[in-house]
Regions:
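Hydrophobic small-molecule pocket/channel-lining residues, especially in calycin-type beta-barrels
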Residues: 23-163
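Bacterial N-terminal signal peptides
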Residues: 9-20
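Intrinsically disordered, low-complexity regions enriched for glutamine and histidine
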Residues: 1, 22-23
Length: 163
């Protein structure tokens, strides 16, 4: 009897420990459209007008459509990021290379995407760094808060998307 009770306690403790270790992750999958009224874009910010996220256990594929420059055609960019911290290289602005990583918060409620892009212009190299924090709001919307640092300074943009 005492041995059975000990086993039950052990199983309960292991179950509790593993459930907190593998916290339920926010469900980011879906086709999302920018809600400009709820977003805080700033004067020169360029947020994606639509985002498609395909989330799996070990990776997420993100497709963004952003407005073209000076009324040009919209630009589409797709990247697949793994959750193991591996650096993924993709094409950035005007042929530059973007290096990105993705990592879940300990509670699984936010996904943090960190990126670095290097530009060459007039023989000089500039670096642009950004950190995106993805989460689902209480009312089921996608929130992407982007903090960026470039030669022009620092900025924070909050984009809110609806399905």
């Amino acid at each position: 009897m005492k041995q059975t009770f000990t086993r039950i306690i052990f199983v309960a403790m292991v179950t509790l420990a593993t459930s907190t270790l593998f916290a339920q992750r926010a469900a980011l999958s879906g086709e999302w459209k920018l809600d400009e009224k709820k977003s805080e874009l700033g004067e020169f910010a360029r947020a994606a007008t639509s985002v498609k996220a395909e989330q799996k256990e070990d990776a997420i594929t993100i497709t963004r459509v952003t407005p073209g420059f000076n009324g040009g055609d919209p630009m589409t960019n797709t990247v697949t990021l793994t959750f193991d911290g591996k650096v993924v290289e993709s094409e950035g602005f005007r042929g530059s290379k973007r290096k990105s990583t993705a990592k879940w918060s300990d509670d699984g409620k936010t996904l943090v995407v960190s990126s670095t892009m290097s530009f060459e212009r007039d023989g000089q190299t500039s670096e642009f760094k950004s950190t995106e924090t993805w989460s689902i709001t209480k009312d089921g919307q996608l929130s992407v808060v982007t903090q960026s640092n470039s030669p022009r300074g620092e900025s924070t943009v909050k984009a809110v998307y609806t399905k």
